[in-house]
Each structure stands twice: as C-alpha cells, then as structure tokens.
Amino acid sequence: MLYKYLFIYIVTKISLSSSLYHNFCTINNTNGSNFNVFDTNNGRFLNKNNRIRNILNKNINKKSSFSFINGNSLKNFKNDHKYHDFTKFTKIPEFLEEDNEPIVSELIRNFCIIAHVDHGKSTLADRFLEFTKSVPPERLKEQYLDNMELERERGITIKLQSARIKYNSILDGKTYTLNLIDTPGHIDFNHEARRSISACEGAILVVDGTKGIEAQTVTTANIAIEKGLKIIPVVNKIDLEHCDFKSTAESLKKFFGFKESDILKASAKKGIGIEDILEAVVVSIPPPKVDLEKPFRALVFDSFYDPYRGAICYIRVCCVFRLYFQVFEGSTKIGDEITLMNADITSKVTGLGIMLPEMKQTHSLQLVNSSGQVGWITAGIKKTNEIHVGDTISLKSYVKKNLVEPINKFENSKPTVFAGIYPCIGGDFDKLQTALEKLKLNDHSFQFERSDSSMVGMGFKCGFNGLLHLDITVERLEREFDTQVIVTSPSVPYRCTLRDKSVVTVDDASKWPDESQIKSSEEPWTDVTLRVPEEYFLSFINIILSSVGSVMSMLSKMRGRFKEKNKVKDTNMVVMNYDLPLSEILSDFFNKLKSVTNGYGSYDYEGTFYEPIELCKLKILLNGTEAKGLAVVTPRNRAYDRGKLIVETLVNLIPSRQFKVPVQAVIGKRVISSSNIPAVKKNVIEKCSGGDPSRKKKLLENQARVLLVLINDVIGKETNGSGRMCNNPF
C-alpha cells in the first residue's frame, strides 16, 4: 500500500492538462492483470473499486487513448526513478470516430504531388486540407504538412508527409478516401519522392506558370511515368500577371505528350481550381488493385523515432518505431504478430491507425476495412537498424507457411557525396552514434560507418545525396538531438586499379593507396541536364568554359563534355546536356549557375560512371607534421591551385603562436605550395637592461623549452576548433 500511495502522490503532483481528451496508462501487476488505470488529464487513479467502467463511459465515451506499461509492479516504479518522469507524457493519438464505417477499395485514391522547389506544392496540399475541411480553419497554417522547423525556415519540403482526406464528388455524389503524400522537390531529396511514387497509383504534376518546367521536375515525373502512375498536369500561379499558361502548357505537351484538355489551371494561393483537381484525382487515378481474400501484406515506405511515447508505453523496450506503410492485400489488427520479411524480425502490433493528417488510432482495432490504405503502425522493436524502408510486413503465421512473397518496390539510394562527422567533444561519441541511428530511421538514404581520425578522434564517415542533404542533416543533428559536430570537407568516391589488378574504391583521402601501388585511377562523372533562359546561354557557356573545361581542353583537363542543346518550342528556354565530373558539382557550380541566370537556371543530374584521370593525394603539413584530416584527393593537373588555396586558407585561419609555423602542401615528398604563420614573439630579455649575459642566455633557453612544448600542439585544436567545415573552399 505504501508503494501504491507513493506512486499516486508523484503522478498527481505532475498531472497534465488537456482540454481535448483524456490520456490513460494501465499499470499491470507482475502476473499481467490490470492493477489500476491512471488518468493523466485529471491526475487520478481509476481502479475497479472506483467504478472504472462508469467513469470511462461518462468521461471519454470509449474514445480515449490508452498506453500500456506491461509486466511492471509498483515496486519497480518505486525503485527506478525514471518511471516517475510523467512530465514527458505526450498526447497519444485519439481513436478515430469513423473507424467502423466500411471503406470500399474502389473509393480509395492514393496520389502524390510532384513539383520543383517553390512551385506551390505545399500550398496546394494546404488548399486540399482546407477545401475538404480535413483540418479546422483555426488550426490550419501555411505548409501544414511540413512539420520540421527547418522546412518552414527554408521554404522547402524535406520529408514526405501523408494525410488522408475525405472528398464528396460532385459527379457521382460518392465519398472518396484520398491518401495524399506531399513529396520534396529538391534533387537531393529525390529518394523521398521515389518512395512516395512507389506507394501511389497517381500523381499531380504541378508547374509554376511563371517559371515553366524545371529540370528536376522532368526527372521526377519520368520516374512516375515509368512506374505506371497516372499523371494529372496542373499549371499553378495563374493569378499572377506574368504567368505564361500557353507556353507552359506547350512545354508539358512537348515533354510528356499531354493533351491540352488534360492540363488544369490553378492558383494554390487563391484557391482557384482546387475542386477541378480533386475531381480529376477521383476520375483519372485508378483505385488500388487489392484482394482482401489474400494474406495480409504491407509496404513500409517511411518510419521515425518517438522518444517520449517510448518512455511511456514501452518501458522495457529501448525505443518505439512508427512505420508508414501501404496495405496491398488483407488486413491486420492490434495484437497480431507481424514479421518484417526482409529483416526477419517478428513483433507484436501495439498500435495502428491512419493520418488525418494527425495520427489517429482505429477504435475497432481493425486497421482498415479494405486494402490499399496508407497508415501507420507501432511495434516494440529494440534496434534502429532493424527497420528498412521497402520491407514487407505480413502476419507471422503467413510467413511461416510461405504464403506471401516480399514486395520489391524500392531501389537502394547510393550516396554521391561523402563527409566526415565528428563530435566537438570527444566524450559525445556515443551520443552522436545514437543520434545518427535515430536520424537514419527517418532518412533512409543517409549512410554512415565508424571512422577514426588522428586529428578529431572517433567519428563517422557519412554518405549523402548532395550538399543540401549534408547541410540539412547537420542542422537536424544540432536541433533535434542537441549534438554539436565537426564536418570535414565533402568528397566523392574515386576508384583505383592497383598493380596486382585489384580495384578499390576510395572516398577518404586517409585510405588512398601508396603512389607506387597505383596502376591507374578514375573519378566519377555524371549526366547533367541544364535548363537556362536563352538570353543567358552565352554567359552560361562562358561559365562552362572557364570552370569545368571545354571539349577542346578535355584531353588535358578532363573537365566538362558538351553533348547536346535543344530549344524548347514556343519558349525562351534552352535545355543542354553535359557530362561533368561529380566533384565539380560539389564546388560552387550551382551558385555560379544561379548567379549568371539571375536565379532562373536549374539543373539535374542522374547516374554515375567513371572516367580515367591521373589523381594524387595532396597532404598538408603543419610545422612539419602531417595533418591527416586535411588531406584531399585531387586531379594532379589541379593540385597546385588547390594546394595553394588550402595553404592560404589555413594561414588565415590558424592564430599566430609564439613561434613561426610553416604550412605546406605536399605531394609525395615534393612541396608544391608553402607559407608561414608569422610568430608573435615575446621579448623575455626586455627586463634585462644590462649585466651578466648568462642571465639573458638562461631566459632564452627557458623560452625555447616552452616553445618545444607548444609546437607539438599546433595540429588539432586550432584546425579542429573551427567547427563546421562543410563550407570551406577546399
């Protein structure tokens, strides 16, 4: 009894307020029977002696949400203070009121929105939610589906988001269930768009009427067409005076073969044409092909980590995972034992539901009454690396009997940019590792492995899909996980053929083979599509010629290969194709493109192939000692320019010491660039105005001994203390 009342006192002092609904947690005895129920809204216990059934019926009408703490007696709560932290309770998703209503598969439409950055994709999603009254007007805000603070600050969509909306068609009067997936538009997050496309039967292609079709939009739309999705073209921003609907429509017809009657007009900002788009979704996009008689199968297309709900509901489990998935066949319910087929992991369903767009649980414990739905599921899985996007979920009994086959829907994304991420404080290595594991659960294109550096200690070598992906990842580490990190300069994977005929891929300069062992080397190239206004074409050609080489200088510099140029009919846009080294895209190529075209130019790149080039390892020496973390791999014919840039940057970056510090760029044993950090000298014999010269000699010898100690401290602190280095010019 003492334990019981002690626990009641603790939780009632920290009761949470909620004007919307009640939250309850059920405490179980060691024998598994319900001990009592605690109402986190009112801070009171409701046990069987307190007429729990009547109170539940009266207060929450059987619609409230429950969280379970299994197999723990009150003695456990008393002895472990972490169970007393009820300040971290979060609102558990409410049960869905319409859960018992049957949903016919023929009335389901799964679709995504494809658009370039700033073409009005998120605004259009807002209008869908507003028009269908899926979100109350007082709660609706701009970029409603963009949950990250970073997304709102930068005005871009980083993570795909799903929402289920109900729409009453004016054509047949039927109520349709529309599963909307809002997708990112930037090329660095193209993997998110690919996952969205794989979970849909149709897509809305949104094009800004003031800018026309962008290169990245063409790439993503072609992926959707290859997957067999029905495309609905929409020209947005028709309310603006400089919107050129005619030329944009002509471009859509040229690139994708649309009929003019298929192209819709809209203004997401003003709410024009929203109903026409929704009707087109209902009429044009086919329902999912399903069979309820077949065994349950679902495709995992996203997941994320929920630390607070894990602390409440799954005390014996390290964390809680929520998986977003699409049901292809059959159905499931809470309590079922499911298996992740590719990972071969079995767990019990502890929660499931849909997005409206907030998470809602299903009251009848039935996830869907028809296949083809998009929803979420929770299961007690102990390790973050056990969740894989593209995995197939099925019931354990079906998997054991080999009644189901995995759904092969995703291709693994290969990183194109590599950088090292290290904790600013050496003791934060475990914290950083945990943060990266949780981040990977929500960003499946992000890859990392452990790496040790003599300069910055233990850390991780990470792979990204581009520089923006790298920048966003570092921002998320700092904001979401409170982890301060050092980021080394981005690099690309090079390939070396050794004299023993073995081939190695090197994405870190510290792993570069000895020069005597290398027979030949190659660097990655990529196929780049550029779209620029015709009036900027000559200026753009000058950029290509000056920064990445022309066809005539290709043999000597191995930079830039022009392939073809096409004029888009009835527009002032020029589309060009180039082969460019991937390392050039990592530099300031994009900034130069935007600068010379006044922001109208765009580019996209896909695929990688290797071209032979003579590469070398450029080492940096500080006071005669190699700074391994500053070494880079570079084309030999550009080594001098890059070495000079690094040396000049370090001379300006490292503060002066009491002695001169030479900074050198070295290839093998040959110094190709050198400079000195001037000394800040202290005149130790200034106080000796005269007298015995041995006194001055002694002071100078003492100073020399101190300098020897300080000299050994040149490497590391000053170069490492600069923090995030991803924007360094070298």
Curated annotation (Swiss-Prot):
Enzyme class of the recorded protein, top EC level: hydrolase
The record's GO CC annotations read: mitochondrial inner membrane; mitochondrial matrix
Output the PROSITE patterns linked to this UniProt entry.
G_TR_1 (PS00301), G_TR_2 (PS51722)
Which reaction(s) are listed as its catalytic activity? GTP + H2O = GDP + phosphate + H(+)
A single MF term (Gene Ontology): GTP binding
Q: What is its EC number?
A: 3.6.5.-
Residue ranges occupied by any tr-type G domain in the UniProt entry: 106-289
Q: Where in the cell is it found?
A: Mitochondrion inner membrane
Give a GO biological-process term.
positive regulation of translation
Gene3D superfamilies per the UniProt record, alphabetical:
3.30.70.240, Elongation factor 4, C-terminal domain, Elongation Factor G (Translational Gtpase), domain 3, P-loop containing nucleotide triphosphate hydrolases, Translation factors
Q: What does this protein do?
A: Promotes mitochondrial protein synthesis. May act as a fidelity factor of the translation reaction, by catalyzing a one-codon backward translocation of tRNAs on improperly translocated ribosomes. Binds to mitochondrial ribosomes in a GTP-dependent manner.
Another remark in the UniProt entry says:
This protein may be expected to contain an N-terminal transit peptide but none has been predicted.
Concerning its family, UniProt says:
Belongs to the TRAFAC class translation factor GTPase superfamily. Classic translation factor GTPase family. LepA subfamily.
What's this protein's name? Translation factor GUF1 homolog, mitochondrial
Task: Specify the species.
Answer: Theileria annulata
